[in-house]
Amino acid sequence: MKKWNIYKATREIKEKYISEIVQGCTFFCDDVFEELIKSCDTLEEAREVLKKYKTDITYYSGNTEDCYLITEYCILPEIYDEDGEIVESGDIVEITEMKISVEDEEWNVVKTFDNLKEADDLVHNDERELTLVY
């Protein structure tokens, strides 16, 4: 039986690896925590469920190094046997969008990015007082 599963994946990425923070960076890595959120009978149902979630990026300072905690959601088709065990997984169909905005002093969006490195570079190389929003 085929199901369309919604997964939540969370990964911690050290600030020095900021260029790794792109859409899909949390899936299929060794240092990732994945959680099944919901199992759907159709792709359309799964897409409706996925709309309720969004990618989250949280910056925090650790004891030794600053990090980002990235959480993403995806739709993954999987086939189950008669015992309810997954016997085959397909390719990811859809992932929540990574949308990182850079705003000026008056909260106007200057530019929107799909990765953190380019957004961070703009903030640090522009003369204006810019802020990252994710």
Predicted segments, located by residue:
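Short, extreme N-terminal segment that most often corresponds to the first beta-strand
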Residues: 1-23
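Short, mixed-charge low-complexity intrinsically disordered segments
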Residues: 10, 34-37, 43, 47-100, ...
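Intrinsic disorder/low-complexity segments
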Residues: 17-31, 96-97
